[in-house]
């Protein structure tokens, strides 16, 4: 087993949807109980699989086969994946979490989850245009929270089978993975992955 530190940097605003909304926000980002955003491991693993599958198809399986890819990602197998991945958090997450936890307890009500989240995110507003009039369509105002460009997420990737082929597949998939989250075709979600 080999452990690696994985770093994902948001090169543009990034929406990692939580699937939740409220009266103020139509589309919220995933965040912990203190308001710090994170990159869910399951979502990243799915993106890596799609990225690697794209490479296998483009190279006509010259780089690696689809069977090798499915084995590494544990698809159709009882053994599970050939690597484990944890959620990616902000650098020094434990220290930040402990600090926010202390402030939440010491000054209850003064430091809210929303205030913490606001320091890492921004809210984007958009409307749909009415094609006939060229103006905003009635009732089309929509907003979504975006993680700020420049935000870095780090976490641990553990390669279970210590073989060069598996490592190469992951390295290529990470290099090929350039977009995540919503609004990718609107200039959002551009990321850089470093192992």
Question: What are these language model-derived features?
Answer:
Residues 1-126, 133-195:
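RNA-binding basic/glycine-rich loop and surface signature characteristic of RAMP-family CRISPR effectors
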């Amino acid at each position: 087993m080999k452990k690696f530190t994985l770093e994902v940097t948001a090169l543009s605003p990034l929406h990692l949807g939580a699937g939740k909304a409220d009266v103020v926000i139509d589309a919220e980002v995933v965040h912990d109980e203190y308001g710090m955003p994170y990159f869910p491991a399951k979502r990243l693993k799915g993106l890596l699989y799609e990225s690697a599958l794209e490479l296998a198809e483009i190279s006509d399986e010259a780089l690696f086969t689809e069977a090798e890819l499915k084995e590494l990602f544990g698809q159709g197998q009882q053994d599970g994946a050939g690597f484990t991945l944890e959620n990616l958090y902000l650098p020094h997450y434990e220290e930040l979490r402990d600090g926010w936890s202390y402030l939440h307890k010491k000054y209850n009500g003064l430091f809210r989850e929303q205030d913490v989240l606001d320091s890492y995110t921004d809210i984007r507003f958009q409307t749909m245009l009415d094609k006939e009039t060229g103006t905003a369509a009635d009732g089309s105002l929509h907003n979504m929270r975006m993680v700020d460009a420049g935000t870095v997420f780090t976490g641990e990737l553990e390669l279970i089978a210590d073989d060069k082929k598996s490592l190469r597949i992951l390295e290529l998939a990470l290099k090929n993975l350039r977009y995540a989250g919503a609004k990718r075709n609107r200039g959002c979600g551009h990321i850089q992955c470093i192992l």
